[in-house]
């Protein structure tokens, strides 16, 4: 309601495309959806001016930053939105003094912020055109976001871009930037814009009069209400930093431009310098050296797995020999060290079961703890199953003390938990579960 009351006093004169500052009058202030008479130091309110050079967030472009000052007050602009058509609302923090409706003010956009925003938005158009030049006309933008120094663009494409394709897109974009192409904006009718091939976002609604932004004429021609540089060279160098999936048939590229590009370059250089010092090779030999180390690491891990498996299985005989007699059934219930995973533990359980006599019932239940979690596996032989002993039932009996769950078939079952301290109690329940089954089937 407050916005509509302010809108009735007249539309905001939006001059962000042509100016970075303006003298204005405070038309009103809003807090919590209600009109208020004023705001004092430390408070945050929404403020409406009769004229503003501040760009309101839209079209994927972040809002401007800056200050609004007047006789006895200073405001920091932290956000700018257009909640209803024709009304620009500034979210401000009162840095000093007191502001009230009717006061005269001077609105000043942060010049560095705006330059960065223009670089990023024009850079978005350049990347879009480069994608279409490299991939073809089906690579069509479906959304974007840009703020000073950073841009991301979502586009239709069925698969990940190869490293070579990504490099080609980046090269085409930077060639267009270095070509110092003119950037021009003009208003025309929507039918005329479509006739000359201006690209529009699918699903977006447009007025009958639209704004077209061109970079190098027809090379890049899009419907756009954002702020832009005057020549492509002002975008500065551009680096595509990532390319990812954002859904079926949709990809996203992210890039840095201007000052943020140089920050990225410094970080990459520091990374390479660190690698060359650590690996003690020149920069151009880093990939080969890393690959060599990875190959050696994989070989070492493979050998470690082999030795670990041998060590685990070496204990199978001792475990089988330590089986307890529970109602005529040989029961092995133990915790094994080494932090075995489910697969390794299963192999050990089956090995121990194979060492038990097939002429009498046999149950093997082993548990292992690793990284604060519990793995447990149970296996029964055929003789035990004939006595109605089920591995699945035993696993379910073990689960509560270790805060877990499990299940499986009558011959093999497994589970996991999050309370390793409950392992001793869980192993005691194995003997109880077997004894109950054997006595019940007798």
Question: What label would you give each PLM region?
Answer:
Residues 1-442:
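A glycine- and charged-residue-rich anion-binding loop/surface
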């Amino acid at each position: 309601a407050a916005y509509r009351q302010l809108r009735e006093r007249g539309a905001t004169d939006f001059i962000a495309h042509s100016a970075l500052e303006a003298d204005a009058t405070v038309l009103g202030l809003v807090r919590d959806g209600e009109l208020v008479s004023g705001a004092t130091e430390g408070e945050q309110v929404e403020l409406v001016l009769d004229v503003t050079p501040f760009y309101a967030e839209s079209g994927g472009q972040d809002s401007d930053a800056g200050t609004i000052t007047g006789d006895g007050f200073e405001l920091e602009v932290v956000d700018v939105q257009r909640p209803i058509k024709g009304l620009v609302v500034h979210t401000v923090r009162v840095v000093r003094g007191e502001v009230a409706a009717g006061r005269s003010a001077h609105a000043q956009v942060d010049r560095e912020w705006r330059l960065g925003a223009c670089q990023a938005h024009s850079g978005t158009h350049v990347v879009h055109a480069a994608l279409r030049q490299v991939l073809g006309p089906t690579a069509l933008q479906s959304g974007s976001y840009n703020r000073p120094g950073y841009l991301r663009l979502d586009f239709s494409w069925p698969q990940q871009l190869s490293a070579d394709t990504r490099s080609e897109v980046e090269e085409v974009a930077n060639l267009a930037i270095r070509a110092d192409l003119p950037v021009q904006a003009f208003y025309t009718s929507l039918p005329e814009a479509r006739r000359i091939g201006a690209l529009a976002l699918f699903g977006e609604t447009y007025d009958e009069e639209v704004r077209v932004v061109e970079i190098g004429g027809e090379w890049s021609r899009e419907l756009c209400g954002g702020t832009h540089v005057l020549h492509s060279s002002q975008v500065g160098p551009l680096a595509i930093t990532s390319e990812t999936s954002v859904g079926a048939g949709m990809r996203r590229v992210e890039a840095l431009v201007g000052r943020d590009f140089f920050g990225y370059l410094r970080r990459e250089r520091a990374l390479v310098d660190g690698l060359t010092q650590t690996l003690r090779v020149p920069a151009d030999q880093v990939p080969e050296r890393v690959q060599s180390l990875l190959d050696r690491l994989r070989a070492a891990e493979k050998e470690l797995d082999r030795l670990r498996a041998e060590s685990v299985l070496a204990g199978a005989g001792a475990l089988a020999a330590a089986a307890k007699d529970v109602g005529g059934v040989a029961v092995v219930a133990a915790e094994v060290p080494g932090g075995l995973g489910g697969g390794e533990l299963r192999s050990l359980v089956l090995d121990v079961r194979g060492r038990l006599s097939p002429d009498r019932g046999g149950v093997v239940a082993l548990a292992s703890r690793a990284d604060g979690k519990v793995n447990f596996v149970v296996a029964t032989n055929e003789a035990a199953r004939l006595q109605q002993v089920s591995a699945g039932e035993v696993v379910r009996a073990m689960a509560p003390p270790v805060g877990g769950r499990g299940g499986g078939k009558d011959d093999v079952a497994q589970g996991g938990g999050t309370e390793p301290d409950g392992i001793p109690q869980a192993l005691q329940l194995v003997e109880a579960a077997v004894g109950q089954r054997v006595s019940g089937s007798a």
